[in-house]
């Protein structure tokens, strides 16, 4: 710290909340001390009263900032990010306004906020300004056994056995999906019509409907595979339910709802097959029951969403869609307006054409959707000049409509992607920390005679020597890997010896 005033004054008088005195804004002679802060070679100069506005922060508390004092140069030295300090100093000058410089990444600026100890309120304000979405708190069960089981099934990265369970779960999901797809192949189906009885599989086809009706055989390999998969899904679901910290919140989780949807169709199908009577085929009820079963069995395909529990990519996609619901709603609304307008326009443009492919406005909805989304399926095309002009305008309007909300959705995706990878990057790159070494008393006397520091600074250093040696010794033991080459603190003893 460099004192620019002629007479040193007690810095304690300029700090609000100090046990000896209080800060008086009317006393200008007590607030004219100026300090120099060196940020990796870039010097900033400000007044003590500016820093004293936030006494709980690193720069506002004399005890906290004294460890970074360089008595030889009479300044404070911080080996930190230089562009970020412009915003940090402005935070003090403006009385609490925090704005991130455009050339500073989000994660770096967040680390600077934590380093200078601006507080949780400043961090929350910064996150709100940057559009951060507050992460939901995930409580753990209080019971130790339930906590271990919950971590085992809910957090695959928590341990080796948890990873093994996650791998097994993924394999079972994939087997279930593959089985669901393979059982529809003609090679695995009996296409004899009106065969029923003894649990034999049968299928019915018609000219208007392409499909199959299947009666489950308990010896069928696909049924056995399906049963084994359901056993695992049910076991996994029940274990999660009994180990979860909140039973009520368990059923509000979208992932648990997907688990229920993946399990229920099997038991409904099994119950229907067991309750089916042979005379139902003659009563005309079998067709309806099989149609319902076909819809229920279709729900099995949603098991693929169970993979999102073990895939960060799918989780990021889901979070992006959830955060972009407003933009997606606007997109659908714009498309709806465009479909109505261009369907009506192309219908009236083609009304006089004898071979018109647009017999009504609702029939033109499909063409408008395909054109606005730039798919261009080609099953319905306008033939008149007016219809082609409407089609051209429809395609151009579709491109503009879809392009408007895309940047917002991409921005949300980038945010969630960087937030997911931030933890991994922090684990790989350790932040350089400072070694809090307190100089000895003789060195302090020499440094005080060799350089100009304020009375309050000297008192803080002397107090640290007398009262904090043990605390800093313990901290040094914890940070034994910290060397002089990577420290923010200046070794005063070595500097005076060199001089």
Curated annotation (Swiss-Prot):
Q: State the post-translational modifications.
A: Phosphorylated on tyrosine residues; phosphorylation increases in response to ischemia. Phosphorylated on tyrosine residues by activated PTK2B/PYK2. Phosphorylation on tyrosine residues suppresses ion channel activity. Phosphorylated on tyrosine residues in response to CHRM1 activation; this abolishes interaction with CTTN. This is probably due to endocytosis of the phosphorylated channel subunits. Phosphorylated on serine residues in response to increased cAMP levels; phosphorylation is apparently not catalyzed by PKA.
What is the reaction catalyzed?
K(+)(in) = K(+)(out)
What effect is documented for mutating residue 111 to A? Alters voltage-sensitive channel opening
- Gene3D superfamilies per record: 1.10.287.70, Potassium Channel Kv1.1, Chain A, Voltage-gated potassium channels. Chain C
What stretches pass through the bilayer?
A: 161-182, 222-243, 255-275, 290-310, 326-347, 389-417
Q: Provide the topology term for how it sits in the membrane.
A: Multi-pass membrane protein
- Which residues are modified to Phosphoserine? 434, 440-441, 449, 468
Site (Important for normal, slow channel gating) at 252
Which keywords label this protein? Cell junction, Cell membrane, Cell projection, Endoplasmic reticulum, Endosome, Glycoprotein, Ion channel, Ion transport, Lipoprotein, Membrane, Palmitate, Phosphoprotein, Potassium, Potassium channel, Potassium transport, Synapse, Synaptosome, Transmembrane, Transmembrane helix, Transport, Voltage-gated channel
Mutation: residue 34 to L; reported impact is: No effect on channel opening
**Positions of short motif Selectivity filter:** 374-379
Task: Indicate where the modification Phosphotyrosine is found in the sequence.
Answer: 429, 458
Q: How changing residue 46 to V affects the protein?
A: Abolishes interaction with KCNAB2 and strongly reduces cell surface expression. No effect phosphorylation in response to increased cAMP levels
The annotated consequence of residue 47 to A reads: No effect on channel opening
GO molecular function per UniProt: delayed rectifier potassium channel activity; kinesin binding; outward rectifier potassium channel activity; voltage-gated monoatomic ion channel activity involved in regulation of postsynaptic membrane potential; voltage-gated monoatomic ion channel activity involved in regulation of presynaptic membrane potential; voltage-gated potassium channel activity
Task: Quote a single Gene Ontology cellular component term.
Answer: axon initial segment
> Which compartments is it annotated to reside in?
Cell membrane; Membrane; Cell projection, Axon; Synapse
Q: Does the keyword Phosphoprotein apply?
A: yes
So what does mutating residue 70 to A actually do?
Answer: No effect on channel opening
Additional record remark = The delay or D-type current observed in hippocampus pyramidal neurons is probably mediated by potassium channels containing KCNA2 plus KCNA1 or other family members. It is activated at about -50 mV, i.e. below the action potential threshold, and is characterized by slow inactivation, extremely slow recovery from inactivation, sensitivity to dendrotoxin (DTX) and to 4-aminopyridine (4-AP).
> What is this protein's function?
Voltage-gated potassium channel that mediates transmembrane potassium transport in excitable membranes, primarily in the brain and the central nervous system, but also in the cardiovascular system. Prevents aberrant action potential firing and regulates neuronal output. Forms tetrameric potassium-selective channels through which potassium ions pass in accordance with their electrochemical gradient. The channel alternates between opened and closed conformations in response to the voltage difference across the membrane.
Entry similarity comment? Belongs to the potassium channel family. A (Shaker) (TC 1.A.1.2) subfamily. Kv1.2/KCNA2 sub-subfamily.
- Oligomeric and partner information: Homotetramer and heterotetramer with other channel-forming alpha subunits, such as KCNA1, KCNA4, KCNA5, KCNA6 and KCNA7. Channel activity is regulated by interaction with beta subunits, including KCNAB1 and KCNAB2. Identified in a complex with KCNA1 and KCNAB2. Identified in a complex with KCNA5 and KCNAB1. Identified in a complex with KCNA4 and FYN. Interacts (via C-terminus) with the PDZ domains of DLG1 and DLG2. Interacts with DLG4 (via PDZ domain). Interacts with PTK2B. Interacts (via C-terminus) with CTTN.
Tell me the protein's name. Potassium voltage-gated channel subfamily A member 2
Q: Origin organism of this chain?
A: Rattus norvegicus
Gene, per the UniProt record = Kcna2
